[in-house]
Structure formats: structure tokens, C-alpha cells
């Protein structure tokens, strides 16, 4: 699989021979969907909670007399039928959203995503993204020259300069290969990979 090797002006300077085992596999939509859903589910904190009628703090006094008012009878204001009352089936913080995906499936799904991005022209290669100083403007100008508005950068090493320069840029996500995830790969419009990162991706997914 040949990928575009971009220069600092964002122009295709040459072609780069990428390993077929990582960038030349068929796209498996069902598998990709499964690992994306599982990754998002496993990222949930699981802290959402609502109160039932027992937990809300309301008086237990009867709101009004049983008969003679013309209104529907009511026992207490904590009823789920009342505004501010407890939920009938509340969300509980102990709910478990974990979905298991084995390593073989996860690796195959990641390779399928990378291969599809390469086929669609959404994945490009650069020599490196080394910065002499942690200046956000310098990195922003580089991405602007490359016409990159929404980009995920996979660098072989995210040093302090690159981290500090990129953390305040909108729609820019910089990670090392081991932290690349399926949700981010699918989300960003363009994926920029350094040459060194390709070697590490090959080690991870071959």
C-alpha cells in the first residue's frame, strides 16, 4: 500500500510504501461497528444516577383530602406522577456497561479502520513533527499550510513541545501509537502519521 508523503507545505512530495498487513486489509463494517461501540461503552464512568420515590425528600403527608376536591386521588407528593417525584425505573450508578472485545478482534478492527482511511485518502504520512519550541502558533501554521482543519496525529513520540503546542488547538488530537483508539480514528477527517509511528503500528498490529 502506497501512502502520500507530505512535506511541510502539505503537498505530496513522494510516495511511501506502507505495510500491507496494516494498511492493505479489507474493511469489515460489522467488526468496526462492534469495537467502536465497545470502546465507547467501556469509556463510560457509570456514575449516572436518579432517585426513586423512596429516595426523594418529600413529606409523606397526603397532599389533599381523598374525596370532594374533584381531583384525582393522591397519596404523597413523591409519587412518580408528580413533578419532582421519584422515577419509576431510575438509572442506577452500579449499572455495568462493560463490553468485552478480545485482542484479536480489536487488532483486526483497528487494521480495518487504518486500511479504509488509506483507501479514502484520509491518511497521510510525514517524516516527523519535531518542534524546537512549544509554540501553538508554529504548529497551527503547519496544519494550516497542510489544509488540515480536523486532524488526528499519530507520532512515534509525543514530547513536551509537541504536547504543549497541540493541546490548545481545536479539532487536533495528538497521540502515540499505543494510545490510538477506534473512535478517534473514525471521528477526525484526516489522520497524519509519522514514519516512526508506522513502524510502531506495524509491531502492534502485525
Swiss-Prot record:
Region annotation (Disordered) ranges: 46-78
GO molecular function, one term: rRNA binding
SUPFAM superfamilies: Ribosomal protein L4
A Pfam family reported for this protein in Swiss-Prot or TrEMBL: Ribosomal_L4
Highest taxon, organism lineage: Bacteria
One GO cellular component term noted in the UniProt record for this chain: ribonucleoprotein complex
Keyword ATP-binding belongs to the record: no
Record key words, sorted: Ribonucleoprotein, Ribosomal protein, RNA-binding, rRNA-binding
GO biological process: translation
Functional description taken from the UniProt entry: One of the primary rRNA binding proteins, this protein initially binds near the 5'-end of the 23S rRNA. It is important during the early stages of 50S assembly. It makes multiple contacts with different domains of the 23S rRNA in the assembled 50S subunit and ribosome.
HAMAP family linked: Ribosomal_uL4_B
Assigned protein family: Belongs to the universal ribosomal protein uL4 family.
Assembly behavior: Part of the 50S ribosomal subunit.
Name recorded for this polypeptide: Large ribosomal subunit protein uL4
Gene that this sequence comes from: rplD
Amino acid at each position: 500500500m502506497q501512502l502520500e508523503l507530505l512535506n511541510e507545505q502539505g503537498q505530496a512530495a513522494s510516495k511511501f510504501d506502507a505495510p500491507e498487513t496494516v494498511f492493505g486489509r479489507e474493511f469489515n463494517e460489522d467488526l468496526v461497528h462492534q469495537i467502536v461501540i465497545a470502546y465507547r461503552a467501556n469509556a463510560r464512568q457509570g456514575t449516572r444516577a436518579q432517585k426513586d420515590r423512596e429516595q426523594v425528600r418529600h413529606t409523606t403527608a397526603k397532599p389533599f383530602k381523598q374525596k370532594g376536591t374533584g381531583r384525582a386521588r393522591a397519596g404523597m407528593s413523591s409519587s412518580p406522577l408528580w413533578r419532582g417525584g421519584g422515577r419509576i425505573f431510575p438509572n442506577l450508578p452500579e449499572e455495568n456497561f462493560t463490553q468485552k472485545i478480545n485482542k484479536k478482534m480489536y487488532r483486526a478492527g483497528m487494521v480495518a479502520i487504518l486500511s479504509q482511511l488509506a483507501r479514502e485518502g484520509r491518511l497521510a504520512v510525514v517524516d516527523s513533527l519535531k518542534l524546537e519550541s512549544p509554540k501553538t502558533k508554529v504548529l497551527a501554521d503547519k496544519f494550516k499550510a497542510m489544509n488540515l482543519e480536523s486532524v488526528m496525529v499519530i507520532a512515534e513520540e509525543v514530547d513536551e513541545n509537541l504536547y504543549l503546542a497541540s493541546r490548545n488547538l481545536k479539532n487536533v488530537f495528538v497521540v502515540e501509537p499505543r494510545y490510538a483508539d477506534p473512535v478517534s480514528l473514525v471521528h477526525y477527517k484526516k489522520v497524519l502519521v509519522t514514519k516512526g509511528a508506522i513502524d510502531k503500528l506495524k509491531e502492534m498490529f502485525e
